[in-house]
Amino acid sequence: MTQRQKESRRIAGLVQVALDTLRNQELAHYTDPVNAPQPYLSSIQLRDLVLQDEHSVSARRRLWARVESVVEGNANVRANLEEMEGGDETRVWRWVGSTGTPGMKELEFES
């Protein structure tokens, strides 16, 4: 497997983690709004969570640019600017698709 193929596979995995995290945040907000007061996550927070094991700044930048492109192109994700605590505006992503359990689609198609 070439380096490019390995990176593409890694990007796909990182995108899936990001989408699952956004879906879980949306669900957590409606299930327990005290512990999850916002239905969205800052793209920067999500980047730091998803790439916590990548310590090279240039690699993080390159990987995140590709992840960001895929996530923002997903019809289930809405990107907005939100004012955070302290008054700073930051880019946030919110899951707007179904929050059903991820494995349910597989079960429906098997029957």
Per-range role (PLM):
Residues Q3-S111:
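Intrinsically disordered, low-complexity juxtamembrane tails/stalks of eukaryotic membrane proteins
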